[in-house]
Amino acid sequence: MPYIPPEHRPPLDEHIDRLAAALVREAQTLPGEAAVAGLLNYALTRLILKVVQLRFGAWRYWLIALVTGVLHNVAQELYRRVAAAYEEEQRRRHGDVEGFAASGPDQPEA
């Protein structure tokens, strides 16, 4: 969960803002809107590898589980906060997919 205490945010935010600006600048030199995906993947991978190297030195199973769990939680929280609202708006705008309403938890049992 990304909700760290407020006093821990400013020292990180200035670096995050600079990295984000650098990623956007680099993405603008590449063809296609989706080119930013590779840059984000690279930046996140390098950040994780560097933090593990500086803090722990070597990978251990518990650390692999911890890092992959964090990445999984990041994806889930982003989906919950951003994608779910977007998808719900599209469902309202364009209509539901046939079959979801009939099999959803809000339907009475037959």
Task: Enumerate the language-model features and the residues they cover.
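Solvent-exposed interaction surfaces and binding hotspots enriched for charged
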Residues: 1-110
